[in-house]
Regions:
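Short functional hotspots at interaction and active-site rims
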Residues: 1-171
């Protein structure tokens, strides 16, 4: 059995600002955009297998989440079962949701994002790749999200260090 942690985050022109190094006595300038173009990254990680599954979509809704469940299902090896841990967002709890045969859903308690290691992934991606920058178009946002997600997903050591918790006991 594999435990997967799933979540979504928004990335766009109203991005985040983070601290940066600057010479002593200077104030660095950071551009803040006024436009509102954005995309969402749907992401899931499996700390035990150091694997992840992600999609970049224009909105969060039932259809996008259904596609993400199918993507997670694709990443689960034949003969294994995945327990996907997630919050109770409205699109996660629809009755018409078609859950793949190799996945079970486990919902986190309300208002407990600290129990989802995927939140650390978002913080890392935003701090390292997506903060303190501007985006000229939707394609620019998608490219930046793709580059950030690919850099993360190609580093098994980073997946492990950001998402492994001592309280995750796997079968």
């Amino acid at each position: 059995m594999d435990i997967w942690f799933q979540d979504e985050t928004r990335v766009g022109q109203q991005g985040s600002q983070t601290r940066i190094w600057a010479p002593k006595g200077t104030r660095p300038r950071i551009v803040k955009q006024q436009q509102y173009l954005y995309q969402y990254i749907f992401g899931a990680v499996c700390p035990k297998r150091q694997d992840c599954a992600g999609l970049i979509l224009p909105q969060v809704n039932y259809d996008g989440f259904q596609k993400h469940l199918e993507e997670i299902s694709f990443h689960i090896p034949q003969g294994r079962h995945g327990v996907v841990v997630m919050d109770r967002a409205g699109w996660h709890t629809k009755k018409k949701l078609s859950i793949p045969h190799n996945i079970s859903i486990l919902y986190l308690p309300p208002r407990a994002p600290e129990l989802n290691p995927q939140e650390m992934v978002w913080q890392h991606l935003k701090d390292t790749y997506l903060a303190n920058r501007t985006f000229s178009s939707l394609e620019d946002i998608v490219d930046a999200c793709s580059n950030a997600w690919n850099a993360f997903s190609n580093s098994k050591k980073l997946i492990s260090s950001l998402t492994t918790r001592h309280w995750i006991h796997l079968i």
